[in-house]
């Protein structure tokens, strides 16, 4: 059964991205959220604890989290449960026109809200491409972002 509707496919063709609603079950999302909090050893109910670490930098890589919120966790089963979930696989298969996919891995992200008293977390980021854009023409690539919690239009990792 296709994941992308005709409207989704037309949107993908026009805009270069598509939103797949309910891509994985809620229990997968909840499990991954738990894994992130556990990995960071942070009590999610203690909002001050969200700032427990200073983000790592090129000079100091002793923190498990970057200023952009990248959490240094790559191989946990909860990540793989989402990467390989059938609905995710099907969506990518439809875009690529092939069921033989190579699953790449990235990590999780958790960035606490910016606060004036925590300037190290006020990083507004930059436009980042996971491609070498100096090579012309730029080769085709597809990447997925899975939001684990509700996110307003004013939040998130896209500019």
Task: Explain the meaning of each model-derived region.
Residues 153-159:
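A short beta-strand-loop-beta hairpin characteristic of the jelly-roll/cupin
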Residues 17, 100, 141, 157:
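A residue-level signal for beta-strand positions that form part of recognition/binding surfaces
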Residues 19, 126, 143, 147, ...:
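Conserved beta-strand segments that form the floor/walls of ligand-binding pockets within enzyme
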Residues 134-153:
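Short, conserved beta-strand element in jelly-roll/cupin
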Residues 1-14, 21-136:
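Non-heme Fe(II)-dependent double-stranded beta-helix
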């Amino acid at each position: 059964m296709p994941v992308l509707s005709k409207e989704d496919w037309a949107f993908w063709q026009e805009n270069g991205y598509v939103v797949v609603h309910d891509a994985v079950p809620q229990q997968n999302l909840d499990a991954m959220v738990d894994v992130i909090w556990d990995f960071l050893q942070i009590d999610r109910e203690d909002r001050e604890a969200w700032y427990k670490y200073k983000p790592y930098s090129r000079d100091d890589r002793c923190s498990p989290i970057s200023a952009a919120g990248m959490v240094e966790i790559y191989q946990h089963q909860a990540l793989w449960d989402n990467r390989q979930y059938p609905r995710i696989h099907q969506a990518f298969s439809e875009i690529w026109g092939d069921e033989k996919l190579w699953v790449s891995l990235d990590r999780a992200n958790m960035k606490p809200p910016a606060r004036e008293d925590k300037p190290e977390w006020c990083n507004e980021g930059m436009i980042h491409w996971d491609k070498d854009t100096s090579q012309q023409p730029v080769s085709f690539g597809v990447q997925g972002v899975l939001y684990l919690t509700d996110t307003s239009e004013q939040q998130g990792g896209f500019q």
